[in-house]
Design a protein with these regions (language model features):
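Basic, polyanion-binding surface patches
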Residues: 1-119
Length: 119
């Protein structure tokens, strides 16, 4: 998997840390019904993941130790293979080491040009 992150973003800061536990993280594919949750994580000065997920059902990934919302379309636990600076972004190349869940139905949350279009 490849993730492209703005260098000045909180996720880039976290994934750049050499102390990241076992160099592992999780990605949740959110459903169209989870715009509010996406907004919490996208906001500047946002609280920690633990606080952002305070009123949202979640689990701790067994392989990554990351907090994972329970109601997305899918969750992936990943291990960092390589970090590549690319202009004003950081590319994180990772191996998927686990798939805690996938949903049977649901529409994905997509952000395009600052909006959430419906497919």
């Amino acid at each position: 998997m490849l993730v492209s992150l703005a260098l000045d973003s909180y996720p880039a800061e976290v994934l750049s840390r050499p102390s990241l536990p076992a160099q592992r993280f999780a990605v949740t594919l959110l459903s169209a019904a989870q715009k509010m949750l996406a907004g919490r994580f996208a906001a500047e000065g946002r609280p920690s993941a633990r606080l952002a997920l305070d009123d949202v059902p979640h689990v701790r990934g067994s392989l990554s130790g990351a907090l994972i919302p329970s109601e997305g379309l899918a969750a992936l636990e990943c291990s960092v293979a390589r970090r590549v600076p690319a202009g004003d972004h950081l590319l994180v190349i990772a191996s998927v080491i686990g798939v805690p869940y996938t949903a049977e139905t649901g529409d994905p949350l997509i952000r395009f040009r600052g909006r959430y279009p419906v497919l």
